Regions:
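Hydrophobic beta-sheet segments that form the core/acyl-binding groove
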Residues: 82-122
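Hot-dog-fold acyl-thioester-processing enzymes
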Residues: 1-84
Length: 122
Protein backbone atom coordinates (compact mmCIF):
# COMPACT_ATOMS: atom_id res chain seq x y z
CA UNK A 1 0.00 0.00 0.00
CA UNK A 2 1.28 3.44 -0.87
CA UNK A 3 1.15 6.15 1.78
CA UNK A 4 1.46 9.83 0.98
CA UNK A 5 4.67 11.54 2.07
CA UNK A 6 2.54 14.44 3.34
CA UNK A 7 2.48 12.67 6.73
CA UNK A 8 6.26 13.03 7.18
CA UNK A 9 6.87 15.48 10.03
CA UNK A 10 3.45 14.86 11.59
CA UNK A 11 3.67 14.81 15.39
CA UNK A 12 2.09 12.06 17.44
CA UNK A 13 0.04 12.79 20.53
CA UNK A 14 2.10 12.72 23.73
CA UNK A 15 1.96 9.68 26.00
CA UNK A 16 2.41 10.54 29.69
CA UNK A 17 3.47 7.87 32.16
CA UNK A 18 4.52 7.98 35.81
CA UNK A 19 6.78 5.04 36.55
CA UNK A 20 6.10 2.92 39.64
CA UNK A 21 8.35 0.52 41.53
CA UNK A 22 5.84 -2.22 40.81
CA UNK A 23 6.20 -1.72 37.03
CA UNK A 24 9.99 -1.79 37.13
CA UNK A 25 10.21 -4.80 39.45
CA UNK A 26 7.55 -6.71 37.50
CA UNK A 27 9.45 -6.09 34.26
CA UNK A 28 12.75 -7.24 35.78
CA UNK A 29 11.10 -10.36 37.23
CA UNK A 30 9.29 -11.17 33.98
CA UNK A 31 12.54 -11.00 32.02
CA UNK A 32 14.44 -13.03 34.62
CA UNK A 33 16.85 -10.20 35.39
CA UNK A 34 17.48 -10.55 39.12
CA UNK A 35 20.16 -7.90 39.59
CA UNK A 36 19.95 -6.08 42.94
CA UNK A 37 19.84 -2.77 41.03
CA UNK A 38 16.26 -3.64 40.13
CA UNK A 39 15.04 -5.12 43.43
CA UNK A 40 17.06 -3.87 46.41
CA UNK A 41 15.01 -0.89 47.52
CA UNK A 42 17.32 -0.37 50.51
CA UNK A 43 20.19 0.73 48.26
CA UNK A 44 21.09 4.37 48.97
CA UNK A 45 20.53 5.15 45.27
CA UNK A 46 17.21 3.28 45.22
CA UNK A 47 16.17 0.93 42.45
CA UNK A 48 16.28 1.55 38.72
CA UNK A 49 14.44 -0.03 35.82
CA UNK A 50 16.22 -2.45 33.49
CA UNK A 51 17.34 -0.57 30.36
CA UNK A 52 14.92 -2.36 28.02
CA UNK A 53 12.02 -1.29 30.25
CA UNK A 54 12.01 1.79 28.00
CA UNK A 55 10.50 -0.36 25.25
CA UNK A 56 7.66 -1.41 27.55
CA UNK A 57 6.94 2.25 28.36
CA UNK A 58 6.65 3.17 24.66
CA UNK A 59 4.73 0.04 23.66
CA UNK A 60 1.22 1.58 24.12
CA UNK A 61 2.01 3.83 21.15
CA UNK A 62 2.74 0.84 18.89
CA UNK A 63 -0.18 -1.08 20.30
CA UNK A 64 -2.72 1.73 19.78
CA UNK A 65 -1.06 3.84 17.10
CA UNK A 66 -4.37 5.21 15.79
CA UNK A 67 -4.96 6.84 19.17
CA UNK A 68 -1.72 8.80 18.73
CA UNK A 69 -2.06 9.86 15.07
CA UNK A 70 -3.81 13.21 14.81
CA UNK A 71 -4.38 13.27 11.03
CA UNK A 72 -7.94 12.20 10.24
CA UNK A 73 -6.94 11.17 6.71
CA UNK A 74 -4.10 8.81 7.73
CA UNK A 75 -4.91 5.46 6.03
CA UNK A 76 -6.24 3.41 8.93
CA UNK A 77 -6.34 0.18 6.93
CA UNK A 78 -2.55 -0.11 7.08
CA UNK A 79 -2.66 -0.42 10.85
CA UNK A 80 -4.08 -3.93 10.58
CA UNK A 81 -1.03 -5.07 8.61
CA UNK A 82 1.63 -3.25 10.64
CA UNK A 83 4.72 -5.03 11.88
CA UNK A 84 7.01 -3.64 14.56
CA UNK A 85 10.25 -3.84 12.58
CA UNK A 86 12.97 -2.39 14.78
CA UNK A 87 13.60 -0.10 17.71
CA UNK A 88 16.59 2.15 18.39
CA UNK A 89 17.08 3.53 21.89
CA UNK A 90 19.58 5.99 23.35
CA UNK A 91 20.09 5.88 27.11
CA UNK A 92 21.02 9.08 28.93
CA UNK A 93 20.19 8.02 32.48
CA UNK A 94 18.38 5.16 34.19
CA UNK A 95 14.60 5.22 34.53
CA UNK A 96 13.58 5.26 38.19
CA UNK A 97 10.29 4.77 40.03
CA UNK A 98 8.64 8.15 40.43
CA UNK A 99 9.89 9.46 37.08
CA UNK A 100 7.20 11.21 35.08
CA UNK A 101 7.86 10.53 31.40
CA UNK A 102 6.44 12.33 28.39
CA UNK A 103 6.90 10.22 25.28
CA UNK A 104 6.69 12.27 22.12
CA UNK A 105 7.12 11.21 18.55
CA UNK A 106 6.65 12.07 14.92
CA UNK A 107 6.57 10.41 11.53
CA UNK A 108 10.14 10.94 10.37
CA UNK A 109 10.03 9.02 7.09
CA UNK A 110 7.78 7.06 4.75
CA UNK A 111 9.88 4.71 2.65
CA UNK A 112 8.88 2.33 -0.12
CA UNK A 113 10.14 -1.20 0.48
CA UNK A 114 9.72 -4.44 -1.45
CA UNK A 115 7.75 -5.97 1.42
CA UNK A 116 5.56 -2.88 1.87
CA UNK A 117 5.83 0.71 2.97
CA UNK A 118 7.94 1.54 6.03
CA UNK A 119 6.53 4.24 8.28
CA UNK A 120 9.38 5.39 10.50
CA UNK A 121 8.44 6.91 13.85
CA UNK A 122 10.98 8.83 15.85
Amino acid sequence: MEISSKFVGMSLKTLASTITWRQTMNYAAATGDNQPLYFDDERPEGIIAPPMFAVAVTWPISERILDFIEAADFPQEIIFTQVHYTEDLSFYRPIRPGDHLLIRGKVSAILPHRSGTLVVLR
